[in-house]
Amino acid sequence: METTLLFNTSLLLTLMILLTPILLPLLSTKLQNTPLIITTTVKMAFFTSIIPTTIFIYSGTEAIISHWYWSFTPNLKIPLSFKMDQYSMLFLPVALFVTWSILQFAMWYMASEPHVTKFFIYLLMFLIAMLTLTIANNMFMLFIGWEGVGIMSFLLISWWHGRAEANTAALQAVIYNRIGDVGLILSMAWLASTLNTWEIQQISYESQTPILPLLGLILAATGKSAQFGLHPWLPAAMEGPTPVSALLHSSTMVVAGIFLLVRIHPLLANNQTALTTCLCLGALSTLFAATCALTQNDIKKIIAFSTSSQLGLMMVTIGLNLPQLAFLHISTHAFFKAMLFLCSGSIIHSLAGEQDIRKMGGLQKLLPTTTSCLTIGNLALMGTPFLAGFYSKDLIIESLNNSYLNAWALLLTLLATSFTATYSLRMTLMVQSGFSRIPPITPINENTPLVINPITRLALGSIMAGLLITSNILPTKTPPMTMPTIMKTAAIVVTILGILLALELSNMTHNLTAPKQNIYSNFSTTLGYFNPLAHRLSSMKLLNNGQKIASHLIDLSWYKKMGPEGLADLQLMAAKTSTPLHTGLIKTYLGTFALSILILLTLTH
């Protein structure tokens, strides 16, 4: 009883602490927020959240559900239902820890910005929307969190709204996510009309769900988690401030799609078509994003494509019927991805906004803490043994090796893993080693604790998070006890091959001034020609067809046939028909009069 009371109290306290900076200014005009207050609030919420998470793990509880009804239709009751299970309780401290570090970094990065308090409030609301999504126990609450992260991402990506690129990127993010939202809304409509409920527990009992609502949910995850086909918004979102990129890519919006599939996984578990769709889509996404990252020169774009590649790996795990592993990768990925973005932000800020890695070099001596943490982050991303990424990434590739599913997906995933090592090492070498290629008057300084503390804190998380999480969670399925050495070491072998490939390419191209253009480098540089084809060609075709339809239907049909000209022609025809009758001869008029009388008499008698 005491344990339950402590759990409920500490969890409620965590949520109330988070809401305080938003609610207090509404109560009194004298209570004004500052970035420091908001950062301290998230820090306090993180330390408070450790208590319920620890109690939950060690009490052996499966789930705690609380709900109350909000009925605005007589047939469909929609409860405000919250579920504290393994996923939501572990995600809570991870998200708070990462957000605390990002907010502390933003106090330095955005110090000279006007309206900086509003920026921090937006980041906090972004986090709250994501936490609403994770603890939601029905599709209605999940949809509120889903749309919340969508609108907050739009506001944050377009924060520098004076720049046309930022506005375009924000619109792109919204439009691509609208496509995914169509799938979610249609699936929710099917669930409400067929099962008469949006409760996830009740939905999970449906053993044979048709493929169409499942494809709608997969489409929703494809849009939100930037899978192949709806991926261009993710690299474009780099136009926002770096703290936004760090929060968006680590623990909020982009993992919302994968989290949706983890939540509704009982529906997918028995449908092989849906699982195969997830597997193939994820394998294609992870390879395509890794291929695009190979030739990028913008440091933030490289990290953005690495996020897209890791999201593809999570989608592969959903396709393998292992949602717990996908969630484990979400948790470990949050630490090193946030750290990579904060390191890139520190470098960009120190170099007066320069993002091109070809104009960096030799930063190991100038920014030792930042570059050391950047190296740790890249090693964790590669899946280096005993760092955070290893505990999830290695397990995913082991499971893929041991599954009876499609070898094509396995080959694509292994190739993408190799490419991950290649572009990570390329970025590390070009940023940190070699001769310095930065202007000599650039003021470089990383002495402020607002930079060093969050980055080193996340570096510690990138080293220890995998071990801590896997030590406290038991796998839902028994892992294979024995397997061939080649299958066990496949992930590390392809990673080493990728590193060797990067070193060889670095040596080969060290003295080249202009690399030769070929079809493969052009494919990677132009992001697979996807943007010109999707944004230019298809838009031009749609606009031309729309113009033709409008001109033919409206101009020709309405104006010519049925509109003013049509009426004029009709009246002219009537006038021409009646004109010959008006001859001016008395005999004609008398004959017409007599004929009219005769017809009238015939009709009346």
Curated annotation (Swiss-Prot):
GO biological process entries: ATP synthesis coupled electron transport; electron transport coupled proton transport
Spell out the molecular function terms from Gene Ontology.
Answer: NADH dehydrogenase (ubiquinone) activity
Broad class of enzyme this protein falls into: translocase
| Domain of life of the native organism | Eukaryota
GO terms for CC? mitochondrial inner membrane
Question: What's its catalytic activity?
Answer: a ubiquinone + NADH + 5 H(+)(in) = a ubiquinol + NAD(+) + 4 H(+)(out)
In this entry, which stretches build a coiled coil? none
Q: Which InterPro entries does the annotation name? A: NADH_DH_su5_C, NADHpl_OxRdtase_5_subgr, ND/Mrp_TM, NU5C-like, Proton_antipo_N
What keywords sit in the KW lines? Electron transport, Membrane, Mitochondrion, Mitochondrion inner membrane, NAD, Respiratory chain, Translocase, Transmembrane, Transmembrane helix, Transport, Ubiquinone
Q: In its keyword annotation, does this UniProt entry include Transmembrane?
A: yes
What EC numbers are recorded for this enzyme? 7.1.1.2
Chief location bin: mitochondrion
- Specify the protein's topology with respect to the membrane: Multi-pass membrane protein
Q: Which residues cross the membrane?
A: 5-25, 45-65, 89-109, 116-136, 140-160, 179-199, 210-230, 242-262, 274-294, 302-320, 333-353, 371-391, 405-425, 449-469, 483-503, 583-603
Q: Where is this chain's protein located in or outside the cell?
A: Mitochondrion inner membrane
State the similarity comment: Belongs to the complex I subunit 5 family.
Biological role stated in the UniProt entry: Core subunit of the mitochondrial membrane respiratory chain NADH dehydrogenase (Complex I) that is believed to belong to the minimal assembly required for catalysis. Complex I functions in the transfer of electrons from NADH to the respiratory chain. The immediate electron acceptor for the enzyme is believed to be ubiquinone.
Q: What is this protein called?
A: NADH-ubiquinone oxidoreductase chain 5
